[in-house]
A protein has these predicted regions:
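N-terminal alpha/beta PP-like core and its mobile active-site loop of ThDP/TPP-dependent enzymes
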Residues: 1-185
């Protein structure tokens, strides 16, 4: 989706939960990736890239409190009308609110300083056993067949593609930051 919208600059704050996103961007030569360990510095660096290029920069971080370090740059982008795309990795629903360290509610975390914020739906073909066991997500149950799980995944993928398209269009058309929260195993 990012390439379809001609988004090429990606600033990655390394972490464990966002490894699939980092690998996805870094392994594609169409993206210009920057790895900056300190989240606050990474966010302001991304802000500068977008300010210079007048194009959205993708900003990627891991789950939990790391995301909050982006907040000052996001607020600056919001009030200065600078487009940023924040992609945060998150724990799946069944791993939230169980007392794990560095876990926060990432939904709408930038509420008053973000144009658009949504959480994508959880992939149901990865870690199916864990999803069934906890079933807090109510995505699939123990009686689901392989065929019904694949059908459900197609529906999830379609919904996520619509959310992404809406988010990216909002970012482009309004020159404001958007946030997509991505649940990952």
């Amino acid at each position: 989706s990012c390439l379809n919208f001609n988004f090429y600059n990606v600033v990655i704050s390394p972490g464990s939960r966002n490894v699939p996103l980092a690998i996805g961007f870094a392994s594609n030569n169409n993206f210009k990736c920057y790895s900056i360990v300190d989240e606050r510095s990474a966010a302001f660096f991304a802000l500068g890239l977008s300010q210079r290029s007048k194009e959205p920069t993708i900003l990627v971080c891991t789950s939990g409190s790391a995301l909050l370090n982006y907040y000052p740059a996001i607020a600056e982008a919001y009030y200065s009308e600078i487009p940023l795309i924040i992609l945060s990795a998150d724990r799946p629903t069944y791993k939230l609110n169980i007392g794990d360290g560095q876990t926060i509610n990432q939904n709408n975390v930038f509420e008053k300083n973000i144009l658009y914020s949504k959480s994508l739906k959880q992939d149901c073909t990865h870690s199916t056993e864990e999803i069934i066991k906890s079933n807090k997500q109510e995505i699939i149950d123990g009686k689901s067949t392989a065929s019904s799980i694949l059908s459900k995944q197609k529906s999830i993928q379609n919904d996520n593609e619509l959310i992404i398209e809406e988010a990216f269009n909002n970012c482009i058309n309004n020159n404001k930051p958007i946030h997509l929260n991505i649940p990952m195993e």
